[in-house]
Swiss-Prot record:
UniProt cross-references to PANTHER family, sorted A to Z: CYCLIC DI-GMP PHOSPHODIESTERASE PDEF, SIGNALING PROTEIN YKOW
Protein name (Swiss-Prot/TrEMBL): Uncharacterized protein Rv1354c
UniProt-listed GO biological process terms: cyclic nucleotide biosynthetic process; cyclic nucleotide catabolic process
SUPFAM superfamilies for the chain: EAL domain-like (SSF141868), GAF domain-like (SSF55781), Nucleotide cyclase (SSF55073)
One Pfam family in the UniProt entry: GGDEF
Domain GGDEF as annotated: residue spans: 212-345
SMART domains per UniProt: EAL (SM00052), GAF (SM00065), GGDEF (SM00267)
Length: 623
């Protein structure tokens, strides 16, 4: 490939590399990069190729991949990490390069030639260095070495610039994915793990066969509200930040610390221990966390109430353990605070509600005591109602109308979730069919949630197809929503079930996107249509920069995989405007409407759009 003009061979070279890099993620980046380098060595007739990334914080360039792999690498490896401040003139030029650089044997490159000779044992080389550029920043280097002299033609360098751009895109995508994963598992204020990471950790620790018991310490700051009221929420946040640091400083070993939100923290000791064995640790924490904290010129002291509980692997769930520890912390707080309490059976009064639900739920399904309400989905640009999500409520015989969070987890634990799902699907399709028969909602999408068990239950796909057909609905007007965690429980079966559902014609959405453990990899393999951004990333848009980063990352992923996006939990005009700026046009949330009964939803569909007062002002360019 030595012509000065673009050739079909060079075009094929770029296309082949683009195809190989298209689906690269963090897990496959190194392997695929090395494979591409090997291909480029063969096609360009050079001896060595390498990929380096710039570390701007350290002002250094780091070796990411090379071909062929070197044998007998010196220790330390002179090529692994090179600081630009100490680099030879050739590498120094690459820190900010924006165009390809060619180096041939000449006096000006003697230092570079010496470095290559030390690493490769070759005295004379010709090289091309092609920068990876993102925006105005040089983020890395794609390099090629020919032992001996070689002329580099303009057409080759242009093709390599295109390939370097592809590598820069992979670099940015992998970095965004890593950042997204970090933000999804960490608390933005303290840097501690968040609830999602805590539950994942407890899932592993409480799995059958793991060593136990597993202790949990639930820490609840006493009277933090007084700091917020007196000094403001910024001071309260600063106090929480210092408090979190002190928890870490007080511990020895690899214990996991998580912030659940507000003034609540959970500590899981790394070693197995009973609640009684964990009590001395809790008391030591209580004493050490009393130290004075200087905030805004004020010297503050706050005590902490700590609840201690333990769970047995294979017998208790993360929810069981955290509920017990929470109940114990509540008992410590009710005792006046600044104390430690160990969970006892007497604290489990809330378990009565669960027993009550287990007793009455099956009868509630059979006796038609369930109710459907609907949450409208709107187009943020116009206010048009473009969909509705069916949500179930239960008219309990003694406790009144219960939200799904009160009884769906119980339904799943006693194998009633499937029966509950089928009731919701039948009732929602029936009501939606009635609306369409009245000339309403023909352009709207009916969204229905699917529980974990359904995707691995035989006959579910046939039931969906039969139900939709019996009510005369177009399958494309129905969207089934699943969560990421539902899928990863049995990925193989879930993937097969979703593929069959797509054959039926229904849409598939990943609900609560961003809160699971395998979000990125799922997008490559599952037949889905839509991502629903979890409300925890939407509610504070406009005040929480970390949430904005996550939303941007999700929008980028959706665009890359050609998926629709719906934002959940839109409660403020600021959040709606930010979503519009990010080109997320479909949304649900209390800003537009709370869940409403079927008759009210019918009236909304008849009106076709929300009142103008419910829709944020938009940029005409986004309409």
């Amino acid at each position: 490939m030595c012509n000065d003009t673009a050739t079909p061979q060079l075009e094929e070279l770029v296309t082949t590399v683009a195809n190989q890099l298209m689906t690269v993620d963090a897990a496959t980046s190194a392997e695929v990069s090395q494979r591409v380098l090997a291909y480029l060595v063969e096609q360009l007739g050079v001896d060595v190729s390498f990929l380096r990334h710039n570390d701007r914080d350290r002002r250094a360039t780091r070796l990411v991949a090379e071909w062929p792999p070197r044998l007998n690498i010196p220790d330390p490896d002179p090529l692994r990490l090179i600081y630009f401040a100490d680099a030879d003139p050739v590498f120094a030029l690459c820190e900010h390069a924006k165009e390809p650089l060619v180096f041939r044997p000449e006096p000006a490159t003697e230092d570079y030639q010496r470095l290559i000779e030390e690493a490769r044992g070759v005295p004379v080389t010709s090289a091309a260095a092609v920068p990876l550029v993102s925006g105005e920043i040089t983020t890395g280097l794609l390099g090629f070495i020919k032992f001996g002299d070689r002329k580099w033609h303009e057409a080759e360098l242009n093709a390599l610039m295109t390939i370097a751009t592809l590598f820069a895109q992979v670099q940015a995508r992998v970095a965004a994915e890593a950042r997204l994963r970090y933000l999804a598992d960490h608390d933005d204020l303290t840097g501690l793990h968040n609830r999602r990471a805590l539950l994942q950790h407890l899932d592993q620790r409480l799995a059958p066969g793991q060593p136990g018991p597993v202790a949990a310490l639930f820490l609840d700051l006493d009277r933090l509200k007084a700091i917020n009221d007196y000094l403001g929420h910024a001071a309260g946040d600063q106090f929480i930040h210092v408090f979190a640091q002190r928890i870490g400083d007080a511990l020895v070993g690899e214990s996991l610390i998580a912030r659940l939100g507000g003034d609540e923290f959970v500590l899981i000791p790394a070693s197995p221990m009973s609640a009684d064995a964990a009590q001395p640790l809790a008391e030591r924490l209580r004493d050490q966390l009393k130290d004075h904290v200087a905030i805004g010129g004020e010297v503050l002291t706050r005590t902490v109430s700590i609840g201690v509980a333990s769970g047995t692997p294979g017998q208790h769930t993360p929810s069981d353990l955290l509920r017990r520890a929470d109940q114990a912390a509540l008992a410590a707080k009710h005792a006046g605070g600044d104390s430690v309490a160990i969970f006892t059976a007497d604290m489990s009064v809330s378990g009565e509600l669960r027993n009550d639900i287990e007793l009455h739920l099956r009868r509630g399904i059979e006796s038609d005591a369930l109710r459907l309400v609907y949450l409208p989905e709107v187009d943020l640009r116009t206010g048009d109602i473009v969909g509705t999500e069916a949500l179930v409520r239960w008219q309990h015989p003694t406790r009144g109308l219960l939200a799904p969070g009160c009884f769906i987890p119980v339904a799943e634990s006693i194998n009633l979730a499937g029966e509950l799902d089928r009731w919701v699907l039948r009732r929602a399709c029936n009501e939606f069919s009635e609306w369409q028969s009245a000339g309403l909602g023909h352009d709207a999408l009916l969204r229905i949630n699917v529980s974990a068990g359904q995707l691995v239950t035989g006959g579910f796909v046939d039931f969906v197809a039969d139900t939709i057909g019996q009510h005369g609905l177009d399958a494309s007007s129905v969207c089934l929503e699943i969560t990421e965690n539902v899928v990863v429980q049995d990925l193989h079966t879930a993937r097969a079930t979703l593929a069959r559902l797509k054959e039926v014609g229904v849409h598939i959405a990943i609900d609560d996107f961003g809160t699971g453990y395998s979000a990125i990899s799922l997008l490559q393999t599952l037949p889905i249509d839509t991502l629903k951004i979890d409300k925890t990333f939407v509610r504070q848009l406009g005040t929480n920069t970390s949430d904005l980063v996550i939303v941007r990352g999700i929008m980028t992923l959706a665009e890359g995989f050609q998926l629709d996006v719906v934002a959940e939990g839109v409660e403020t005009e600021a959040a709606a405007r930010i979503l519009l700026d990010q080109r997320c046009y479909r949304a649900q949330g209390f800003l537009f409407s709370r869940p409403v009964p079927g008759e009210a939803m019918r009236h909304m569909l008849s009106a076709r759009r929300l009142p103008p007062t419910c829709i944020p002002a938009t940029d005409p360019a986004l309409s």
